Amino acid sequence: MEALLQGLQRQDRMGALQDSCEAELQELMKQIDIMLDHKRSQWEAETETMKTRLELKEQELNCALDREERLNQEVRRLRQQLIQQEEETQNKTTQYEAQLSGFKEELNRLKKSYEKVQKKHLRSEMKAKAEEERSEVSRLTRRLEEFRQRSLDWEKQRLLYQQQLAGLEAQRKTLIEQTEMYQHQSHNRKQMLEQTSLVGRSELQNLSGQLHRANDSLCAKEEELETLKIQLRCAVEGQKRAEHETELSKQAVQALKEEKAELRATLQAHTEFLQGSRVQKHELLPEGYRGSEVLRENNSIRSVEERLQEMGQVGGETEVEAIRSKLSVSRMNEHRLQAEVTCLEDSVESVTSQCQLLAKELKGKEEYFHGVKEDHQKCLSENKKLKGQLSQAELTHKSVLDGMRKEISQLTQELHQRDIRMASSAGIDWERKIKAERQRAEREAAEHRMSLNALENLRQENCRLSELLQTQEPDVAQALVNLEQANQRLQRELLQTQEKLELIAQRRESEIQNAVDSISQELLNKQEQELRIMQERLKVYEQEMQTFRSQQDAASSGSSLESIFSEVWKEQATGSPISAASVDSAIEPVEDLASSLPVPPTSPANAVASRFLQEEEQRSHELLQRLNAHIEELKQESQRTVEHFTQAR
């Protein structure tokens, strides 16, 4: 009985422990559900971010292709404009050459007419005015000396002009050197771009390898998660079975407790009955003794009866009858007591057998509860292992995603820095070129002013000579007037050509400045538009993420543990290539973007940067070509003007 009571007490303690374990297990399952919901929302958010980034990179690629197409169209348009300008310059040069040839013919004609007039005048005056001719000859010789002196001065001016031409040639050489330097710089830039592109390709290859490895590791982790999910399902089912069995065991324990109470009551009744029977036995023992004495007396009475019968005594019959009645009563009491004793013995045997059966059942229940407790401990240990594995997998996944985010941020920062450096270097180059162009234009303007001053001096000298000739000879004066008119006409044409050259130079400078301003403005506008588009996309993405999170929270509140695991597995199965591709910009579809471009996808940032650098290099190369062509045109025009001045003089 004491062993039975101890077993029941142990069962009570086991039930309390089982209740506490069930509460802890339910709390643990709730925590696991919350953690899985949180991680699922994080994974969904990350997959959506990777998808949006992939779409953004594809749109950027399309924009870059459209930009390249527009640049090609602009290049074709500029080429057509260049061809038209070359045709116009050729037409102008032919016109100027025709005008110069006309001027030369007119000068030759005037010289011939002047010589004819002079010869005619000399012939007519030769005979009549010999002395005057002599004086005139002497005067003319003096004038010839003066003209020789002036010719020496003109020779000096010619030397000065030659020096100016040498200076212009030196300027041309310096400009050629500058162009070569620009070409060398562009070649160096091209090499640097090629090196950066090679480095970017190597980085892309490394990233693609890392992403492939990450994909393999993610696949392995997905398989591990599948096995863990199966194990967790088995553990949950085992836990449910254990809970059901614990409920059944509780019911059995409750029934056993009731049976125990009933058995205790029956035992108490049986013990009381045994005690009463023992008391009755003790009470009936003297009666038995008395019955035995009565039997002995009965025997003695029988013997007495026999004797009386023998003796024929009738007076003792009444006593014998009384003794017989007493004996019958004592026999009945003895039989009743024996029956009660046998009943009590049978009841005691049945109670002892029931107690043995209950002890065996309690022992079996204790063993069953011990097994259930061990299973519960195993389930708890398996749950802990699963939690550890899940936390480790989450940490590794989080570390991988953090690394990918860091790489993407570094690539974007490098792209922005490269854009800033390229824009600053391009602006500095343009400023230098514009400054050099302005200095050259100022030098040309100074040279033009010097030539104008020289022409003004020549005009004054011609006026003075014409006045002297008018005072002496009318024919010579008329010829000089004609020459002066021709000279004035040539000066007007020279001024017109100078004005045209200045207008052309101003127009070219304004075109260059407008082109620089328009290109810089276009670049700034494009960058601002791209930034606005990125900001709008980020806002839209944040709104979509908020709505998605709200929907996910509403959907996850009514989902069970098994549905959560299945959804997480599906999301991983669909989202793992994106997360792998997302730094591949971040994973495999992006890697298809870098090779097609694919990465964060094959680092789309490097592909866009390389294309942007190639476009900037093309633009700089085209601008250098245009500047070289403009410089060559200005040099040719300056040479033409110098030749025109020398021929006119």
Swiss-Prot record:
- What InterPro entries does this protein map onto? Cep63/Deup1_N
Phenotypic consequence of S560A: Abolishes phosphorylation by atm and atr preventing spindle assembly inactivation
One cellular component GO annotation, for this chain's record?
spindle pole
Q: What is its main location?
A: cytoplasm
Q: Where in the cell is it found?
A: Cytoplasm, Cytoskeleton, Microtubule organizing center, Centrosome, Centriole; Cytoplasm, Cytoskeleton, Microtubule organizing center, Centrosome
Protein keywords: Cell cycle, Cell division, Coiled coil, Cytoplasm, Cytoskeleton, DNA damage, Mitosis, Phosphoprotein
Q: What is any Pfam family matched here? A: CEP63
What's this chain's function? Required for normal spindle assembly. Plays a key role in mother-centriole-dependent centriole duplication. Plays a role in DNA damage response. Following DNA damage, such as double-strand breaks (DSBs), is removed from centrosomes; this leads to the inactivation of spindle assembly and delay in mitotic progression.
Question: What is the name listed in the Swiss-Prot or TrEMBL entry for this protein?
Answer: Centrosomal protein of 63 kDa-A
Which organism is this entry from? Xenopus laevis
What is this organism's lineage? Eukaryota, Metazoa, Chordata, Craniata, Vertebrata
